[in-house]
Amino acid sequence: PDGTEYSGLSAPDFMSVREESRTFEQVEAYTGGVVTLLGVGEPKQVLGIRVSDGFFDLLGLRTALGRGFLPEENGPGRNRVVVLDHGFWQREFGGDAGVVGRTLSLGGEPYTVVGVLERGARPPAPGDVYAPLEYDETFSAATAQGRRSEYLGVLGRAGQGVDAGRVRADLERIG
């Protein structure tokens, strides 16, 4: 209704924009889906959102407990950490501050809780649990097929004084 067009980017296209843009100060990505949570009462389906390491910072979102994600946690095999949504933490863990450091099973894999978002945090991709994106071979710019899989939501902050025309031209230059 506001005239804004929304579409996804492939992982290689996201990395190209992130690395080659001359107009964005910061570019972050997210994707999500339903995952099974075990170890907290009965098994249940929760909404899991994978985000790039600077996603929370770009949006000005802070943690009430613990921390957000570190850049190295986007590496293969190093992304088994989660940040919980504040409301989810209240409902499922009764607001227990001892949740930080606890291990949860999500989709059959162990994840360590490293933080809880502050009350009132409203990310554009609301979820119950947030985990880092895994930058691996699917993020390789050389993977042509990967460019056809446009599953990432992408957000960016343009530099001071950069208008929409310059951003558009920059994105066209990148491809």
What residue spans do the PLM features occupy?
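Mid-to-C-terminal secondary-structure elements
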Residues: V34-V35, L47-P71, R80-G175
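Acyl-group handling in specialized metabolite and lipid biosynthesis
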Residues: P1-E5, K44-L47, E73
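Short acidic, glycine/proline-rich loop/turn micro-motifs
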Residues: L38-G41
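Membrane-proximal extracellular/periplasmic loop immediately following the first transmembrane helix
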Residues: P1-V34, S149-L155, D170
